[in-house]
UniProtKB/Swiss-Prot annotation:
This is SUN domain-containing protein 3. One of its GO terms (cellular component) is meiotic nuclear membrane microtubule tethering complex. One of its GO terms (molecular function) is protein-membrane adaptor activity. The gene is SUN3. It is found in: Membrane; Nucleus envelope; Nucleus inner membrane. Residues 193-354 form the SUN domain. Self-associates. Interacts with SYNE1 and SPAG4/SUN4. Proposed to form a spermatogenesis-specific LINC complex with SYNE1 during sperm head formation possibly implicating a SUN domain-based heterotrimer with SPAG4/SUN4 associating with SYNE1. Residues 1-47 are nuclear. The short coiled coil domain is proposed to be not involved in load-bearing and force transmission from the cytoskeleton but in mere nucleus anchorage instead. PANTHER family: SAD1/UNC-84-LIKE PROTEIN-RELATED, SUN DOMAIN-CONTAINING PROTEIN 3. Keywords: Coiled coil, Membrane, Nucleus, Transmembrane, Transmembrane helix.
Length: 357
């Protein structure tokens, strides 16, 4: 039975009791006037009874109304329940997201660890170079002390040939220290946002024998990805190798530019584990790509990397363009004699960015 029905029945019961009480009261009043001398006491009794019944009626109606309100409160409680479920669902999702974060942080930690390892190896390489330079300078000083000529007065006389030799040595040292300073922005730098488009890039060279030999050291690991050429760390073995002497790669630059020059870098024979750099690229060409790396190829120039020159060689583009390009394609036609693979260490692209940059 619903709360409303109970309330209506209670109200009808109250009206009937009131009518009966009124009728009885009227009859008693007449009786008290005509026949009953003790009418005041009876009237007070009926008043007590009526007050009690009225109080009980109000209590009953209030109880029924309270029950009805509780029944009508169910939809609101349902909405509250749904809100609680949604809140706990949101908390569960956030908790799961927090559980996933350590895995992502672990991957980031691995990358940072690899970068630290690469930097450490590069520091060791630079320390070796510094030791070599110190040895050269020490030999130069010893040579200066031991190769003075003396005149009849006992004063030292400098040998012109020896002075020229020392000057050449100093110039060589200064040249080696300056040769990596291109002093132009590199828009093919991975850390700046550049990337390799795999669909436009040759397959990497795979050599299980090389993997076993260099495992744990990192030299010429066939797992080296193509985007290694977009990173500044250059030391023996950290290169992208592709089969044979011909290959290509498509580079998405960090931003749109009007390209003006490119730079290719390789290690020198002095630091090569094999003692030669026959896997270095030789002839190569550069193209600009329009329309989001899928449009027409614009020829920018063809060049030769000289293995006997400096390790870092910059080439001015032979054909100027007037439109801003986002992608550059590098085609390599030959190497310096290696029969199995070509190894590319670093490739840079220079130019003028858009005015909005």
């Amino acid at each position: 039975m619903s709360g409303k029905t109970k309330a209506r029945r209670a109200a009808m019961f109250f009206r009937r009791c009131s009518e009966d009480a009124s009728g009885s009261a009227s009859g008693n009043a007449l009786l008290s006037e005509d026949e009953n001398p003790d009418a005041n006491g009876v009237t007070r009794s009926w008043k007590i009874i009526l007050s009690t019944m009225l109080t009980l009626t109000f209590l009953l109606v209030g109880l029924l109304n309270h029950q009805w309100l509780k029944e009508t409160d169910v939809p609101q409680k349902s909405r509250q329940l749904y809100a609680i479920i949604a809140e706990y669902g949101s908390r569960l999702y956030k908790y799961q997201a927090r559980l996933r974060m350590p895995k992502e942080q672990l991957e980031l930690l691995k990358k940072e660890s690899q970068n630290l390892e690469n930097n450490f190896r590069q520091i060791l390489f630079l320390i070796e170079q510094i030791d070599v330079l110190k040895a050269l300078l020490r030999d130069m000083k010893d040579g200066m002390d031991n190769n003075h000529n003396w005149n009849t007065h006992g004063d030292p006389v400098e040998d012109p040939d020896h002075t020229e030799e020392v000057s050449n040595l100093v110039n060589y040292v200064l040249k080696k220290l300056r040769e990596d300073q291109v002093e132009m922005a590199d828009y093919a730098l991975k850390s700046a946002g550049a990337s390799i488009i795999e669909a436009g890039t040759s397959e990497s060279y795979k050599n299980n024998k090389a993997k076993l030999y260099w495992h744990g050291i990192g030299f010429l690991n066939h797992e080296m990805p193509p985007d290694i050429i977009l990173q500044p760390d250059v030391y023996p073995g950290k290169c992208w190798a592709f089969p044979g002497s011909q290959g290509h790669t498509l580079i998405k630059l960090a931003t749109k530019i009007i390209p003006t020059a490119v730079t290719m870098e390789h290690i020198s024979e002095k630091v090569s584990p094999s003692g030669n750099i026959s896997s270095a690229p030789k002839e190569f060409s550069v193209y600009g790509i329009t329309k989001k790396c899928e449009g027409e190829e614009i020829f920018l120039g063809q060049f030769i990397y000289n293995k006997t020159g400096t390790t870092v060689q910059t080439f001015e583009l032979q054909h100027a363009v007037s439109e801003y390009l986002l992608c550059v394609k590098l085609n390599i036609f030959s190497n310096w004699g290696h029969p199995k693979y070509t190894c590319l260490y670093r490739f840079r692209v220079h130019g003028t960015p858009g005015k909005h940059i």
